[in-house]
């Protein structure tokens, strides 16, 4: 053991998205000593695979960048195990993700605020924190929806490839709308996306928040520091033990904040005796606080790629030629421009698949190339694809430790496709996507569907394809959800971010989300952490901003969703 007498005001477990925000904001108080413990390595400036936007497919599945999690056999996916990439570097998954910045719909946060005690998490209270974190280069300076001076610098997708414009036009031909900013007044519709790319480099949470703060004398950031144990005296956390370079180090803490993400936070809680008492006893762990919601309510977004052959030589398919990659890479190294300087998810859309939902339940990412996330490209000279899937499925999963060993990965199951509603929306998702991709605007480029292929038509054929081909969109959340103490499944007090029943143990990360949002979740996690930082510091919260936002049937005549062939049970 070493560092036995070292004490900190705040120990933050996890240097990912939320941990980076907290490390910066909490260390703004110069009289507070802050320690961030990150189990992965540093996000080196020279590391092309995490700094180069177009290299995003390389870290996934690579043990140097990815913790390489997997679900158990998913019972409704034909027993498949679904791989889950989790960032193994400073910045966490913000250092290996797709860099897409989506706030979610304002009505997501109205849903968060519905339970008694959650009122301060509605859109009006969250909006100022979104604006605080953003520097939106694509927004007008007078835009009251967007932030202009925050640490996260956002690039509006130029979407200049002709395939993007044809896709947006196809959405209009199918009966939808265009929208200039899916993070602004109107999410519903088709248009350019914001990306966390600045001057040709990935804008991770660590780059935006942690690195600028590291010069502060009261902030310490330790990488390759794997937390093995949280120490307690009754209901109070007193410190942590972590392993680094083969040695154990124990430090004292006035407060411990879990920011390990939707996998590691519930795992550490269960290892600490916080969770379902009977389950913990079955693993030989003495229960400390009975909170059956720890590891439950687990949500994720599943997605598929609908791929098409492109008749015109306008796609990015040739850039996947291994002979061209060195030249593309050199251009990026010396100029930070070219094909490698974009994540290429420069546009897409949000729509409702049926009239039973109040706001978009489908998200489309359009890509002017036909390639899987693992880098496997379609066998065509030119292609394009749409990523699609239901955004607020009612399927719920769980995470459970397998033993008392902190190094053993937990048992994970999301129960994808486990409900009739989930299956219904999946069938609708594929039919809505096909309807858009078959519009006249796509005719100059549409060389035919590659995947799933024209032979997949019936409800069951579609669902069978999803079972075989569906992949995670890498948005796990809600496994230690916020909620009032009256909710037996709530884990975190929404007013303090403290674990129910504990005095100084807090949770700030995606696991605390009460339910997922209808898009990529990195932006909501940053917002949650910004808001939590003010709570932890005892600062007056930012004033809520009550401004109008788009609701279908209220702001235009679009009273219903576009009709597609209905799902038949």
From Swiss-Prot:
Cofactor dependency: FAD
UniProt-listed PROSITE patterns: GMC_OXRED_1, GMC_OXRED_2
Active site: 475
Annotated GO biological process: glycine betaine biosynthetic process from choline
Keywords (A to Z) from UniProt: FAD, Flavoprotein, NAD, Oxidoreductase
This protein's record includes keyword Transcription: no
UniProt cross-references to SUPFAM superfamilies, sorted A to Z: FAD-linked reductases, C-terminal domain, FAD/NAD(P)-binding domain
A single Gene Ontology CC term: membrane
UniProt keyword NAD present: yes
Pathway assigned to this chain's UniProt record: Amine and polyamine biosynthesis; betaine biosynthesis via choline pathway; betaine aldehyde from choline (cytochrome c reductase route): step 1/1
Chain positions recorded as FAD binding sites: 9-38
Similarity comment: Belongs to the GMC oxidoreductase family.
Function: Involved in the biosynthesis of the osmoprotectant glycine betaine. Catalyzes the oxidation of choline to betaine aldehyde and betaine aldehyde to glycine betaine at the same rate.
Protein's recorded name: Oxygen-dependent choline dehydrogenase
Organism per entry: Staphylococcus aureus (strain MW2)
């Amino acid at each position: 053991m070493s560092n036995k007498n070292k004490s900190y005001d705040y120990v933050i477990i996890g240097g990912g998205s939320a941990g980076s925000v907290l490390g910066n904001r909490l260390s703004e108080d110069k009289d507070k000593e802050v320690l961030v413990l990150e189990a992965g390595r540093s996000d080196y400036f020279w590391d092309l695979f995490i700094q180069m936007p177009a290299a995003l497919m390389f870290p996934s599945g690579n043990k140097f960048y990815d913790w390489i999690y997997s679900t158990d056999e998913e019972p409704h996916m034909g027993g498949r195990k679904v791989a889950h990439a989790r960032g193994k570097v400073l910045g966490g998954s913000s250092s290996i993700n797709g860099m897409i910045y989506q706030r979610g719909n304002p009505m997501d946060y109205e849903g968060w605020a519905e339970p008694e005690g959650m009122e301060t998490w509605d859109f009006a209270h969250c909006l100022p924190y979104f604006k605080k974190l953003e520097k939106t280069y694509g927004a007008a300076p007078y835009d009251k929806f967007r932030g202009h001076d925050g640490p996260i610098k956002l690039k509006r997708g130029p979407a200049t490839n002709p395939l993007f414009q044809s896709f947006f036009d196809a959405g209009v031909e199918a009966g939808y709308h265009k929208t200039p900013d899916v993070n602004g007044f109107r999410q519903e519709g088709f248009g350019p996306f914001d990306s966390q790319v600045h001057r040709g480099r990935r804008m991770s949470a660590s780059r935006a928040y942690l690195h600028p703060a590291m010069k502060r004398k009261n902030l310490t950031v330790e990488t390759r520091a794997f937390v093995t144990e949280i120490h307690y005296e009754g209901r109070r956390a007193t410190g942590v033990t972590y392993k680094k370079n083969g040695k154990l180090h124990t430090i004292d803490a006035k407060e411990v904040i879990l920011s390990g993400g939707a996998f590691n936070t519930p795992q550490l809680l269960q290892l600490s005796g916080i969770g379902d008492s009977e389950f913990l006893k079955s693993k030989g762990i003495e229960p400390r606080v009975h909170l059956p919601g720890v590891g439950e309510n687990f949500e994720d977004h599943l997605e598929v790629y609908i791929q098409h052959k492109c008749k015109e030589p306008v796609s990015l398919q040739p850039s996947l030629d291994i002979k061209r990659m060195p030249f593309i890479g050199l251009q990026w190294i010396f100029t930070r421009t070219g094909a490698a300087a974009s994540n290429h998810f420069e546009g897409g859309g949000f729509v409702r698949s049926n009239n039973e939902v109040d706001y978009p339940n489908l998200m489309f990412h359009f890509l002017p190339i036909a390639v899987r996330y693992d880098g496997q490209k379609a066998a065509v000279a030119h292609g394009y694809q749409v990523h699609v899937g239901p955004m607020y499925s009612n399927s719920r999963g769980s995470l459970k430790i397998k033993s008392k060993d902190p190094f053993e990965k937990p048992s994970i199951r999301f129960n994808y496709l486990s409900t009739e509603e989930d299956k219904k929306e999946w069938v609708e998702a594929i039919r809505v996507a096909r309807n858009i991709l078959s519009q006249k605007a796509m005719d100059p480029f549409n060389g035919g569907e590659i995947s799933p292929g024209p032979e997949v038509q019936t409800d069951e054929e579609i669902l069978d394809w999803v079972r075989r081909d569906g992949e995670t969109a890498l948005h796990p959340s809600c496994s230690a959800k916020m909620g009032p103490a009256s909710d037996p499944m709530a884990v975190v007090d929404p007013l303090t971010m403290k674990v129910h029943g504990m005095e100084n143990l807090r949770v700030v990360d995606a696991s605390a989300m009460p339910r997922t949002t209808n898009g990529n979740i990195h932006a909501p996690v940053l917002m949650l952490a910004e808001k939590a930082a003010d709570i932890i510091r005892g600062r007056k919260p930012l004033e809520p901003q009550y401004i109008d936002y788009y609701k279908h049937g209220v702001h235009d005549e679009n009273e219903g969703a576009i009709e597609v062939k209905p799902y038949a049970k």
